Amino acid sequence: MDNNGIVVRKFSFKKEFTRFFLVIALFVFVIFFYCFNPRFLTYMNIMNILREMSVMATLSMSAMFVLMVGELNFGIGAEATMAASLLGTLLASQILPGYTLCFVAVLVLMMAVAWLNSRLTCYLRIPAFIATLAASKLWDSAIYKMTGGKTFFSTKWGDVFTTIGQGYTGPIPNLVIGLVIMTAIAWILLEKTRLGRHIQAAGGNAVSATQVGIPVRRVKCVAFFLATLYASVAGIFLSSKTGNITPLMGSNMMMDAICSAMLGATFWRIGRYNIPGTLVAACMMAVISNGLTTMGAADWVQFVLQGIMLTIAVAYIAITREEGLPGVKLA
């Protein structure tokens, strides 16, 4: 405080560097990959990165909703694949007329998955990471039944199946437009509604939230429903992008999505899971994946390098921040 009674905040390089670590890391990765391959920043490759980011960010927001209420959902990968498999099955069987009706039907059916997750966790009080992991095995069995345990594709899907994932509206990929819509919905819900404030309060201190009248159990249930909704959309985005469905396509992205959501808590609102941080982290993950691919790195090298980079990033933030990384309840 100065002589005039005005509070003066001291600049802390360590604090500010930690706060913007994700953005700095993103630029470092971009420069690194560009130096190895100047084609990394061509228009087409940037569009590929944005398309990959759109899927990752949508799935990361799915993880973020549950992390916000202090829980951990290990079922979002299976839920993503489940939604894509249901959509592919409905379109191939032609039980329902039109893509839109099938899309809506899938989202409605996936709410049954969310209902089971919320009941197991919020009412039977089974730790969320155990309940969702166990439930994901049920979804895996259904996925293998629908796909036959192999790549699933049908000529009956038509071009509409890949319109979202491979099409463009002008110069902008449809996937990016889809991400903007999903982000806007999440932002309005979390930042402009009472439910959003309750979700953030429930994760901060459930006991205090209950004492001030917030229905924590109900709020957590809503978080699981939102997580399943976003995981379902992410799965549909991914299958539309690739043009087919594989049994493990969602599960292969799950840990990256959870890491993105957790790393997002180190940007913008430090110590709190938030949308801007999640988007930046998802973009960084997409840049890493695309950059290693353009360098011609083998798959196992990509996994090793991604693991090392994520470990270094998380360890650095955990060490430099006094509070460490935001936590979740595992019991």
Regions found by a protein language model. Give the residues of each.
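Single transmembrane alpha-helix segments in multi-pass membrane proteins
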Residues: 28, 32-94, 120-125, 263-275, ...
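Alpha-helical transmembrane segments within multi-pass membrane transporters and channels
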Residues: 95-136, 184, 280-281
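Inter-helical junctions in multi-pass inner-membrane proteins, predominant
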Residues: 38-48, 143-144, 190, 196, ...
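Hydrophobic core segments of alpha-helical transmembrane domains in multi-pass membrane transport
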Residues: 22-34, 63, 107-110, 136-140, ...
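Cytosolic-side transmembrane-helix boundaries in multi-pass membrane proteins
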Residues: 1-31, 204, 210-218, 290-331
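Transmembrane alpha-helical segments in multi-pass inner-membrane proteins
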Residues: 231, 241-304
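Transmembrane helix-bundle core of multi-pass membrane transporters
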Residues: 124, 128-192, 219-222, 241-250, ...
